[in-house]
From Swiss-Prot:
Residues that span the membrane, as ranges: 9-29, 44-64, 71-91, 143-163, 225-245, 259-273, 286-306
Organism, scientific name: Oenothera parviflora (Small-flowered evening primrose)
Keyword Methyltransferase: no
Job of this protein: Required during biogenesis of c-type cytochromes (cytochrome c6 and cytochrome f) at the step of heme attachment.
Signal peptide start and end residues: none
Known partners and oligomeric status: May interact with Ccs1.
Keyword terms, alphabetized: Chloroplast, Cytochrome c-type biogenesis, Membrane, Plastid, Thylakoid, Transmembrane, Transmembrane helix
Localization, UniProt: Plastid, Chloroplast thylakoid membrane
GO terms under cellular component: chloroplast thylakoid membrane; plasma membrane
Protein name: Cytochrome c biogenesis protein CcsA
Amino acid sequence: MIFYTLEHILTHISFSLVSIGITIFLITLSVDEIIGLYDSSEKGVIGTFLCITGLLVTRWAYSGHFPLSNLYESLLFLSWSFAIIHMFPYLKKQKSYVRTITSSSTIFTQGLVTSGLLSEMQQSEILVPALQSQWLMMHVSMMVLGYAALLCGSLLSVALLVITFRKARKIFSKKKAFLKDSFSFVEIQYRNEPSNVLLSTSFISSKNYYRAQLIQQLDRWSSRIISLGFIFLTIGILSGAVWANEAWGSYWNWDPKETWAFITWTMFAIYLHTRTNPNFQSVNSAIVAFLGFIIIWICYFGVNLLGIGLHSYGSFNLH
């Protein structure tokens, strides 16, 4: 009972901390001068990380096994993984838009954990025979770490696509306006006000420069994080195959979870392949990452909703 109460308290504290942290961080994005607020948001995420760590340790202590046996526990570990990724730029003393993605992802997963959707899984139970193995920690932790990194990298690619397509729309609308003005007498006004034209041109050039810098930063960070996630995912799939051979006598059975894990791995392998070709980098690779983002959620949530296959012990029902 004590462990359950402690877990309940830590869950809600972590959710409150990350909620306050992301609110402060969003304020600092618009007001860069408030350094104190920025430090407070980072300390809030560190506090969230410590609370989730305490949650996992508490659950491990009273359950007797590493807490990765169902969707509720894997969501806790997913939040913990997002918090770790969030702290990398902070430890390097870099201001990065990665933290906007990771903090938002943490609050989303913690929101699911604290909601009543997974209440039937909050009570720890004895592991089914198939999960009573040392491979549980190795396989599931690598898979969830891989999911966390791939989701963060994919969201950065989505942000890149949004900025790029907004820029393309503005360029298209400006071309239409230019063609329309070419047949009018607007150029007379420009001759009378050359200084305004120069100021406007300088402002647009500066804005385009910072937008290009942002796109480049998003592209670089998404590539790095997805590469890291792909390594974790590969290790997770390989360790799962070895575990499956020990438990079921076959390395691969093509059940829904395994099939979608393979599809996820293939999609991000295609992403990494597009990164080797300069003609397919940035926007094209970001589109592949966006498709991979959708596939991850199908693999992680969609298959669990089905509740079929060899991995059905991690499924849940919506009431």
